[in-house]
Amino acid sequence: AATGKPIILSTGLSSLSEVADSVAYIEKCNPSYISERKLALLQCTSSYPTPDDDANLDAMLTLKSEFGLPVGYSDHTLGVDAIEIAVALGAEIIEKHFTDTREGQTFRDHHVSLTQDEVQKTLDKMQKIVTLKGDGEKILTNSESDAEHHITFRRGIYIKRDVSVGEILTAED
């Protein structure tokens, strides 16, 4: 924290209270890490490979809510599903191991790592997810307003006269 360089804190093997202690210590050393959001917290399960039911991606939402800092995901699961879900949940940082090949490799990291081709495909998919998520603002989109059908899509059924509860409607109504 003394250097002022951004810190990415992986939270593997940590409870929420331990993360809180770490955040408090960093803030004590240099308050700008919090005020300028130079500290990011990564949800991480330190297990190789991480079983799907231990990934706990929603913990990113807990970290975001609790600390108001950028969050991300340090992935040790097999494949890329967890990364894609993390991005959809709002991860700003993704950490995933990569390797030139998994063939003939015995070290644990290679089994959870992506190859060069997989990295590029995953980056493309992550960008698509971010695009599909949008910015969260509910507005009439350009594709809706530019379309000729926007009026016909807003049609509805209306009654011409007052009716009583339980009255059966007819075509004339």
Regions of interest found by a model, annotated:
Residues 1-173:
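Catalytic cores and adjacent flexible loops of soluble metabolic enzymes
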